[in-house]
């Protein structure tokens, strides 16, 4: 299909982008790589009156070391996340998950900010951001605002970004200590959305799990933390059997969708199995 008619602006600065977006109110949308928004436009599931193209704003691109955190620009592509040395050193699970996104064409165009601002629970990076305890940096006419990833995703395709706000970056805490990680994903084809995905981070100490963080993809209307499984894994031996037992509670508190790709019970089963695998791999078991 052909998208509905809209006005188009391509600002030359973030300030101009904020002004343009504010002028359009709730009927304006931001586009960067377009890998999430363009399909919705073509299907007329989204029909903004104004499209604000931030694809030329280099100030929104790149990775910076800012002490205990990395500041990642919203326009940083999946491909750049995969290959950035700072990301690989300090939050490698983000690179690992980005490498599973769709196909090379999408990874070269799609952006971190677009994936997060789109708010699709089937996307790979929202669950990773939640597991990492990332903070979203938004900018509007009132200035800059920071939003914890745990508070950012409100409902299906709905985030805490207010009308007129642009996601400019993501602050990701550096992993300090003996951390391992794994992103496990089940999908029908390489290009498909995740039926279920699991982002697991494990801090190891003397052969045991000192701390576990688990983010779930496509197990509800938003990305989720598997808090019951996290608690069960903490203090457990870093062995496959012990972590598989901890993973048995990974689906507690979830509300997975049912569709052509999997019934809710099937997704709950996948969450338990993939969590066990991800925890074991992250723990080096």
Explain the meaning of each model-derived region:
Residues 1-285:
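C-terminal structural segment of proteins
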